[in-house]
Amino acid sequence: MILDLFRKQKYITVQPESETREIPEGVWVKCERCGEILFKKELDKNYKVCLKCGFHFRLSAFERIAMTVDEGSFKELDAALLPVNPFNLPDYESKLVSARQSTGLNEAVLTGEAAIEGYPAVVVVMDARFMMASMGTVVGEKITRAAEAAAAGRRPLIIFSASGGARMQEGILSLMQMAKTVAALARLGEEGQLYISVLTDPTTGGVSASFAALGDIVIAEPGALIGFAGPRVIEQTIRQKLPEGFQRAEFLKQHGFVDMIVPRPQMKETLARLLDLHLRGEK
């Protein structure tokens, strides 16, 4: 009995049954700016704006339209226009096919007639998922036709820009779209119609140097990258350090290139108010 007190007790370790639950892909999203882990449903409810730091995630064209126009009012224009391979580059067609499959779009821009809080407008939305929304012949043609439709129907034109610039696979033909879209906007202005340009992240290259900069009212989303060449390219060229926030929406507003910075949750309301003022002025 006494020896039993000094004997080492024998224990059986029982491992609890634990089922490792796999979290379905896409339930949580990490903020690119602050690193916060966000519940995707909550992020979507907040217009894809980070609830902690206000970072604006990029949107697809379909998401942008759903957030901006009245439900069921969007009627797409020129959906059948498809890009071709003018210089027979070996990889271009496969890149187009891949972009169509991954985005559900035929090109990097959606155009259509819609209503915003009941106010009619022609709406253009670029989608950076499609080859960084580079501007080729079809993108330029669709934007030109949208401007012409706005002029013919005496409706305001709203363009949401997002682009990496001209589409290099279409060479000089892509650069010609800069002049083409600008000419169409000039004709729209002659008709006395309002053109609102909304700059989203990123708006660069030939798009920033053409139609995106020509709005009667230029709006930008917070933190959007806006400029012709990227900051790194400029720094390497001039061999100087650029100011903090250079080419961001806030910097451009301070220097007069942007009229308004509008957070995404207030975008529809702001556009409706501007359309209302314009229509009152026409009466």
From Swiss-Prot:
Q: Which GO terms describe its molecular function?
A: acetyl-CoA carboxylase activity; ATP binding; carboxyl- or carbamoyltransferase activity; zinc ion binding
| Subunit organization | Acetyl-CoA carboxylase is a heterohexamer composed of biotin carboxyl carrier protein (AccB), biotin carboxylase (AccC) and two subunits each of ACCase subunit alpha (AccA) and ACCase subunit beta (AccD).
Q: How is the cofactor bound?
A: Binds 1 zinc ion per subunit.
Enzyme type, top EC level: transferase
Required cofactor(s):
Zn(2+)
Where in or outside the cell it occurs: the entry states: Cytoplasm
The UniProt entry's GO biological process terms, in alphabetical order, are:
fatty acid biosynthetic process; malonyl-CoA biosynthetic process
Which NCBIfam families did the record assign? Answer: accD
Q: Could you tell me the EC number(s) of this protein?
A: 2.1.3.15
Reactions that this protein is recorded to catalyse: N(6)-carboxybiotinyl-L-lysyl-[protein] + acetyl-CoA = N(6)-biotinyl-L-lysyl-[protein] + malonyl-CoA
Q: Which InterPro entries match?
A: AcCoA_carboxyl_beta, Acetyl_CoA_COase_Trfase_b_su, ClpP/crotonase-like_dom_sf, COA_CT_N, Znf-ACC
Which positions, given as ranges, span the membrane?
A: none
What lineage is this protein's organism placed in? Answer: Bacteria, Bacillati, Bacillota, Clostridia, Eubacteriales
Which keywords does the record carry? ATP-binding, Cytoplasm, Fatty acid biosynthesis, Fatty acid metabolism, Lipid biosynthesis, Lipid metabolism, Metal-binding, Nucleotide-binding, Transferase, Zinc, Zinc-finger
Q: Name one GO cellular component term.
A: acetyl-CoA carboxylase complex
What name does this protein carry?
Acetyl-coenzyme A carboxylase carboxyl transferase subunit beta
Superkingdom classification of source: Bacteria
Q: Which residues form the CoA carboxyltransferase N-terminal domain?
A: 27-283
Outline the residue ranges of the record's C4-type zinc fingers.
31-53
Q: What is its main location?
A: cytoplasm
Q: In which pathway does it act?
A: Lipid metabolism; malonyl-CoA biosynthesis; malonyl-CoA from acetyl-CoA: step 1/1
Identify the stretch annotated as signal peptide in this record: none
